[in-house]
Amino acid sequence: PQQEKPQENKKHLNFISREHMLFATPFWQTKVEGVDNEPIKKYCYELRDKTKGVVISNRGGWHSKEILQPIPDELKNFFNQVQGWANNYCAQITGITDLVLGNWWVNINPPGTYNRRHDHQKSILSGVYYVDCEGENIGRLVVERDDNMEFFTTRYQTTSPMCMNNFNMLPYTGFLLMFPAWVYHSVEINRENRDRISIAFNLVDPNQRFEEYGKT
């Protein structure tokens, strides 16, 4: 007898696919134009010479105490621009448009010094601006992810943004980077025969009290 053909399965699965880029970490980088770094550099050295520094993330070098207000004349133009940039940047990712400058400080790293891994708790955005920073061995700025990706020691650990554990940037005079304050970051040893000078800062909710601002 003729064998019965098996019935074809005519059911098809329909997939509606959608890509979700969840938990992305935005960074904003620019080269600052229109800011005279020479008076800022002079201010940084004068501040170092007349005030006692602190040890927080710095290993060697000089780290000023946190500064709230008033902003010195040498930095008013710079911080006015920073606040505008920060709110534009933050508006694109959160809708927040009223961040204000919280605290800021000066870092002077002579040869052989560096800044260890740290974050800036209780702030919303953090940033760093390099006032004087030249040379291939001046020390890279390193930002790190903190979601256990380091446990996946596989061939997938590539330079893909999805797989990398950290990202290194070689700063230069005029380099500005802003990022979410919870991002861990560090700065490598300065191996040049000159100082590395930077100004770091935090931007916060305008209703946040000064004593709540994040520390380095």
Model-derived segments and spans:
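Hydrophobic residues positioned within well-ordered beta-strands of beta-sheet architectures
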Residues: 28, 102-104, 125-127, 197-201
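Cationic, low-complexity basic patches in intrinsically disordered or flexible, solvent-exposed regions
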Residues: 3-6
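Catalytic core of non-heme Fe(II) oxygenases with the double-stranded beta-helix
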Residues: 106-178, 188, 205, 209-214
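Ligand-binding loop in jelly-roll beta-barrel domains
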Residues: 187-198
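A short coil-to-beta-strand element that immediately follows conserved catalytic motifs
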Residues: 94-104
